[in-house]
Amino acid sequence: MSLKCGIVGLPNVGKSTLFNCLSSAKAQAANFPFCTIEPNVGVITVPDERLTKLAELVHPGRIVPATCEIVDIAGLVKGASKGEGLGNKFLGNIRETDAIIHVLRCFEDENITHVDGTIDPIRDKEIIDTELQLKDLETIEGRLAKTEKAAAAGNKDAKLEVSVLKAYKEVLEQGKNARIVEFDTKDEQDCARNLFLLTAKPVLYVCNVSEAEAKSGNALTQKVEALAKEEGAESMVIAAKTEEDIAELESYEDKQLFLEELGLEESGVNRLIKKAYALLNLETFITAGEMEVKAWTYKKGWKAPQCAGVIHTDFEKGFIRAEVIKYDDYIQYGSEAAVREAGKMGIEGKDYVVQDGDIMHFRFNV
């Protein structure tokens, strides 16, 4: 299971700088891979210190972390929903992502002009929101024109879709995002998911600030944080230019020293990647052996057979049981054998809900 996040924002808010920081994330852990698929697409690793600690005990041939695909989506201007600027390309690219990282400018710099002349992250947010909402309304109206005829003829599925579409339409016409709409039944939720509405995607608002404000933010970031809470969205503060400087440092020690001088325990890039991972309700289980220590991504709440299927579909089809070691137990006892001896290995069936950090070994037969 892969995670794909799109970075969006108006011109000159620091979007490309942030993408460059993320693209340099490989330098923070030399063993972890990074590759560029296209000039504006990168695959970066999800930071997880548990893998390194397990590797010190297991001595595997390699460490394989979870990955996240980041897409630097072309800058947006007013009228994108009508195809202005790079609008159609922008909206096509964002539709393919799982979550949105929305960069908002919260710093003053007379050398970097703002497209609207002043610094106002709330206004900037609303510009992009409006364009996405208009595109979603266009999508909904097109679907309604087709679906209402089938619903009138008595088609049960069409009736369900019409009710979902109208619920979204009502909210969007009020200038609100589709993600605030909640559906009670699984059928409604599945129908809503299959519409792939832009404003239904989870969003992380990233407030780009100056180096001096990297730790605590400022009055503008506080406004964004308050608005994000109202929406049920996430927000964070990052100094993208400073993160770019940190990424250029060669040694891990120099990076940590720089962070300490700023009063930060962890780089903003690492925090952002973790937040993006959590934004989609994703967690990690681990397999640990002589060949590799590997992180596997799954949806929170998944049961053992579903997680087995992440490794291979045969594992899910022929699932017998899962041998589970809690991460803390593995670290405490130092090896799988010692965990077994201590009676700390769990033998779990098909109803076991996998927990973040579980070290799993699946038994199956096909």
What are these regions (language model features)?
Residues M1-T113, E141-G142, K146-T147:
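Conserved G1/Walker A P-loop phosphate-binding module
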Residues S2-V8, V13, F19, K146-V353, ...:
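C-terminal-of-GTPase-core extension/linker across diverse P-loop GTPases
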Residues S24-A25, R50-L51, G75-V77, R105-N111, ...:
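Conserved nucleotide-binding/hydrolysis micro-motifs of P-loop NTPases
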Residues A30-N31, I112-D116, G217-A219, L249:
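Short amphipathic alpha-helical segments
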Residues F34, D48-L51, V64-I70, E84-D98, ...:
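Amphipathic alpha-helical transducer elements in NTP-driven molecular machines
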Residues L76-K82, G117-L132, A151-K156, A212, ...:
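Flexible beta-alpha connector loops of hexameric P-loop NTPases
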Residues R95, A99-H102, F107-K135, T139-G142, ...:
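Switch/coupling subdomain of P-loop NTPase systems
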